[in-house]
């Protein structure tokens, strides 16, 4: 797995870039959000990446932040959304804007992204609800919560302990942001026993 690249930016042709890392050029597709934040060609750059291996190709996708990559990983888990469509969504809106649209069940905003119709937008709301966390607090809409990966791990542990998915998700809502999985499970169990 190629998780991160640090090297010299040698080509920029939207949506693709090439990064030279010790003499090896890595081509990656990037969202337009990432593309516009890249330095000029010839300068050093760091990119968080996701490698997708298909029968006919190895595709590398690059992101300016780990949060954008995490959002991409959640998007490609949604039925009907492939890697290129997920990249298009992240080109149309930031990870925080996407999290806000999902939290507000804003199907109209979600379906404004390229390749996303009303039914896919509704599926996104259904499948991503509670999995995306906005990090920039806007209008007090988002309460602090553990990062999406930690939340999934905490919920998974509670499910393994025999709690229903509804109970597990409700218990995780009271766990503060930045809490590791072990402490998060302890706090969630405490919430369940109240």
Curated annotation (Swiss-Prot):
Region (Domain II): 65-143
Entry's Gene Ontology cellular component terms: cytoplasm; Holliday junction helicase complex; Holliday junction resolvase complex
Region (Domain III): 147-194
Compartments it resides in: Cytoplasm
Region (Flexible linker) residue spans: 144-147
Gene3D superfamilies to which the protein is assigned, alphabetical: 5' to 3' exonuclease, C-terminal subdomain (1.10.150.20), DNA helicase RuvA subunit, C-terminal domain (1.10.8.10), Nucleic acid-binding proteins (2.40.50.140)
UniProt feature coiled coil, ranges: none
Keywords assigned: Cytoplasm, DNA damage, DNA recombination, DNA repair, DNA-binding
Matching Pfam families: HHH_5, RuvA_C, RuvA_N
Keyword DNA damage among UniProt keywords: yes
Region (Domain I): 1-64
Gene Ontology biological process terms, A to Z: DNA recombination; DNA repair
HAMAP family: DNA_HJ_migration_RuvA
Function noted in UniProt: The RuvA-RuvB-RuvC complex processes Holliday junction (HJ) DNA during genetic recombination and DNA repair, while the RuvA-RuvB complex plays an important role in the rescue of blocked DNA replication forks via replication fork reversal (RFR). RuvA specifically binds to HJ cruciform DNA, conferring on it an open structure. The RuvB hexamer acts as an ATP-dependent pump, pulling dsDNA into and through the RuvAB complex. HJ branch migration allows RuvC to scan DNA until it finds its consensus sequence, where it cleaves and resolves the cruciform DNA.
Record remark on domains: Has three domains with a flexible linker between the domains II and III and assumes an 'L' shape. Domain III is highly mobile and contacts RuvB.
Subunit and interaction comment: Homotetramer. Forms an RuvA(8)-RuvB(12)-Holliday junction (HJ) complex. HJ DNA is sandwiched between 2 RuvA tetramers; dsDNA enters through RuvA and exits via RuvB. An RuvB hexamer assembles on each DNA strand where it exits the tetramer. Each RuvB hexamer is contacted by two RuvA subunits (via domain III) on 2 adjacent RuvB subunits; this complex drives branch migration. In the full resolvosome a probable DNA-RuvA(4)-RuvB(12)-RuvC(2) complex forms which resolves the HJ.
Name this polypeptide is given: Holliday junction branch migration complex subunit RuvA
